[in-house]
A protein has these predicted regions:
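Amphipathic alpha-helical hairpins
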Residues: 1-122
Length: 122
């Protein structure tokens, strides 16, 4: 599941680059501070995990938190593109938003199983 989403993410980057080129030309990439904070926190929690099942839950929870953040951002820019009449950009962003929602659903299923395993290991 994570490998599939990694490939989707690469496609999303290409779509975003296309949108940026159409809108403003060239844009210098910047590191997202909120995303970096989510990743840093996840690393700390993984390092403190007491066993593998708990570590799995932490990783899946971190992935879901990242998905929630991405869904919020893509929802906002998707809505904005629709409001200002950018039909092509709206379509590209909507596809990305759908992929993020699908990834979140898949993570939810994995998290349910991981939580059960962690509970048994406790």
């Amino acid at each position: 599941m994570l490998q599939t989403h990694l490939q989707e993410t690469r496609e999303q980057v290409s779509r975003l680059e296309k949108i940026v080129q159409q809108s403003v030309g060239k844009l210098e990439p910047k590191r997202s501070k909120p995303m970096a904070a989510l990743i840093d926190e996840a690393r700390e929690l993984v390092d403190d995990a007491k066993n593998d099942p708990v570590r799995d839950v932490i990783i899946l929870t971190a992935c879901q938190r990242i998905e929630y953040y991405e869904i919020a951002v893509y929802s906002a820019v998707c809505n904005f593109a629709e409001i200002i009449g950018e039909t092509e950009q709206f379509g590209l962003l909507k596809k990305t938003l759908e992929q993020e929602n699908n990834a979140n659903e898949a993570l939810r299923g994995l998290a349910d199983s991981a939580n059960t395993r962690a509970d048994r290991a406790a």
